[in-house]
From Swiss-Prot:
It comes from the Eukaryota. Belongs to the WD repeat MET30/SCONB/SCON-2 family. GO terms for biological process: protein ubiquitination. It holds the Pfam family WD40. WD repeats lie at residues 339-376, 379-418, 420-456, 458-499, 553-596, 599-636, 639-670. The keyword NAD does not apply. Component of the SCF(sconB) E3 ubiquitin ligase complex. Keywords: Repeat, Transcription, Transcription regulation, Ubl conjugation pathway, WD repeat. InterPro entries: F-box-like_dom_sf, F-box_dom, G-protein_beta_WD-40_rep, SCF_subunit_WD-repeat, WD40/YVTN_repeat-like_dom_sf, WD40_repeat_CS, WD40_repeat_dom_sf, WD40_rpt. Pathway: Protein modification; protein ubiquitination. The gene is sconB. This is Probable E3 ubiquitin ligase complex SCF subunit sconB. Residues 1-38, 249-287 are annotated as: Disordered.
């Protein structure tokens, strides 16, 4: 049996036997003066063994001058290829760790000169070796390692094999990866390094985050955030307009008066008289001056004057996230407005203006920032049941049967409309269309563009609420006859009736078109079906057809032939409240009741909704916040000593009015 070949040392020569090693040890003890000679001899041998290896694999640095012309095959050898971790043209090539290399250098310098030279030769061999040779060297070294050494290798390698992929990849791919992270993970990623922070805080990532969460519920995490404060958007718009009007094309500032803010600009009378509004008051002029003072502080020749100041999307998300968290946990401040002498029946707020109507026949305008009453509008002879205002006008409806148009900034009554034979309970205007609901069981449509009016008949009891959708030219109405109707303004007919409530329906609110309802969340209630105005066929059949009994079945539109030619469809979802103590979510195209909200102990008088939540107020003096997708009651507020009769909803606050003569505003702004 042949003996095994001797093990080859890492320096290229055969390893010495055990006897030879012992003999050398004895000789070294007897002849210590020969150690320097042995070291010098070993260094020469090592140099002769290492130099050819280095010259072969690193010819540019170690090959002699006379051997420059090497064979092309040797240059393109598979063993001389770089691995992907050591490609000089790759960004993922790992850089030296400065603290580790400093420690390594200090430990190396603590060794004798001969040991330093031997270790350096080993490093040189490994550094010059191609990928295949490196693997062989590593396998041989690890085969001789004991467990403590293998444990050291395992611990060290765990950190070395990590690659900074964010820094290595192109920014576009890094942004794509970061867009999959949630808010918490993004904030942690920004703490890794400066490079990670620059990418994790970039507007590309946070704009995507805002798109997923603001004004809608994220499908992945279920988190939704309110819109940006409209007041900030308007102030930014006004500043841009003022800056544009005070500079000409040559960059010089003319002696011109800045443009008035949007809420102080003169407008035409909504009644169609064509008269201009009066000149702005001292208060309105002061608003303009405040906007101009901020511009006057900047030098006229500075570039900053022309630059639009953008707010980083991360700050936008941060601001909205705080508001959304306050909504979730019910953290809010409350301001109470007192001044009416009878129950508050209607209200609306916008920016810092709050308008309230009461059974004391007055309308009060409040400053929400200070809580002070600005002015009182008087003119109605009976209780005020409904109102709505915009930047230029306020329209109110009263139990005296009249509709009045006011200049709420001055308190002047511009015009009065009478057309109902009973009190006006509800109204809503959009653009040039005004719809009013009355105790005379009708809905009246007022068109201020062509000065025309029409009556929509079909309800058999008081009509409590109306909503106009200008885009689809339709109107929703809710009545004490326990139904909700959808009307076509072009044909002046009812195209769908929603049945399901067993109490008088008090409110109907179309949800924004951005609202999305998952199909798996649907609670189909087959006993709540819609019909059409004919009512000549069974409810189940009419709900299946989705059309009038004498109409031709339309395959393209569930709302009838008039919606087949590309006409905008009505809002897809509506919510209603009734005195049966329930709130219902409906799909308008099919008439199905998708969800019923239970929780109030008595009839629900007030209702407001957006894409994130539903707010309701009831006879039980409670206000409830609902998730429209799950039907869960997220929060209940108390405080009123009388039934809650009206609600106004904003992105970061809501207001409630009650028969206790008080108005409460809940602000979730951080």
């Amino acid at each position: 049996m042949s003996s095994p070949p001797p093990f080859t040392s890492i320096f290229g020569g055969p390893a010495e036997s055990a006897e030879e090693i012992d003999a050398d040890a004895d000789n070294s003890q007897l002849k210590p003066h020969n150690r320097s000679n042995v070291t010098a001899t070993s260094a020469k041998l090592v140099g002769k063994s290492v130099a050819p290896f280095l010259a072969k694999h690193v010819p540019d640095q170690y090959a002699p001058l006379g051997s420059q012309n090497r064979e092309p095959a040797a240059l393109s050898s598979a063993n001389s290829r770089y691995c992907y971790r050591h490609r000089p043209d790759r960004k993922c090539r790992r850089q030296a760790d400065e603290p580790t290399m400093d420690k390594l250098q200090r430990e190396l310098e603590s060794l004798p000169q001969s040991d330093q030279q031997g270790i350096a030769h080993v490093w040189s061999l490994f550094s010059a070796a191609p990928a295949k040779h490196r693997k062989l060297i590593l396998q041989g070294i690890m085969a001789q390692c004991c467990f403590p050494q293998l444990s050291f290798i395992s611990t060290t390698v765990r950190d070395l094999i990590r690659i900074d992929f964010i820094a290595a990849l192109p920014p576009e791919i890094s942004f794509k990866i970061l867009c999959y992270l949630d808010t918490t993970s993004l904030c942690k990623a920004a703490q890794v390094s400066r490079r990670w922070r620059a990418l994790a805080d970039d507007d590309v990532v946070w704009h995507r985050m805002c798109e997923q969460h603001i004004h809608r519920k994220c499908k992945k995490c279920g988190w939704g955030l309110p819109l940006l404060d409209r007041k900030r958007l308007r102030e930014s718009k006004r500043e841009i307009e003022i800056r544009a009007t005070t500079w000409d094309v040559n960059g010089t500032s003319p002696k011109a008066t800045p443009a008035l803010p949007e809420d102080a600009s003169p407008v035409a009378d909504s009644s169609g008289t064509g008269k201009r509004k009066p000149e702005p008051s001292e208060e309105e002029t002061a608003v303009v001056k405040r906007h101009c003072q901020s511009l006057a502080m900047r030098p006229e020749g500075s570039e900053d004057y022309f630059k639009t100041r953008y707010r980083p999307w991360k700050e936008v998300y941060k601001d909205r996230f705080k508001v959304g968290t306050n909504w979730k946990y019910g953290r809010c401040s409350i301001r109470i407005f007192k001044g009416h002498t009878n129950g508050v029946m209607c209200l609306q707020f916008e920016d810092n203006i709050l308008a309230t109507g009461s059974y004391d026949a007055t309308i009060k305008i409040w400053d929400t920032d200070t809580g002070q009453e600005i002015r009182t509008l008087r003119g109605h002879e009976s209780g005020i049941r409904c109102l709505q205002f915009d930047d230029t006008k306020l329209i109110s409806g009263s139990m005296d049967g009249s509709v009045k148009v006011w200049n709420w900034r001055t308190g002047d009554c511009i015009s009065t409309y009478t057309g109902h034979r009973g009190g006006v309970i509800g109204l809503h205007f959009d653009a040039t269309i005004l719809a009013s609901a009355s105790v005379d069981k009708t809905v009246k449509i007022w068109n201020f563009e062509d000065k025309s009016t029409c009556l929509l008949r079909g309800h058999t009891d008081w009509v409590n609420a109306v909503r106009v959708d200008t885009a689809s030219r339709t109107v929703f109405s809710a009545s004490d006859d326990c139904t909700v109707r959808l009307w076509d303004l072009d044909t002046k007919s009812c195209i769908r009736t929603f049945h399901g409530h067993v109490g008088q329906v008090q409110q109907v609110v179309p949800l924004p078109r951005e609202f999305e309802f998952e199909e798996h969340d649907v609670e189909c209630e087959n006993d709540n079906l819609s019909t059409v105005s004919g009512d000549t066929e069974p409810a189940s059949l009419q709900a299946t057809l989705g059309l009038e009994s004498n109409a031709v079945i339309s395959q393209s539109s569930p709302f009838g032939p008039s919606f087949e030619s590309g006409r905008t469809a009505p809002p897809r979802y509506i919510v209603t409240s009734a005195l049966d103590s329930t709130i219902r979510l409906w799909e308008t195209s099919t008439g199905r009741c998708l969800r019923t909200f239970f929780g109030h102990l008595e009839g629900v008088w007030a209702l407001a909704a957006d894409t994130l939540r539903i707010v309701s107020g009831a006879e039980d003096r409670m206000i409830k916040i609902w998730d429209p997708r799950t039907g869960k009651c997220e929060r209940t507020f108390t405080g009123h000593s009388g039934p809650v009769t009206c609600i106004g909803l904003g992105d970061s606050r809501f207001a409630t009015g009650s028969e206790d003569c008080e108005v409460r505003m809940y602000s979730f702004q951080s």
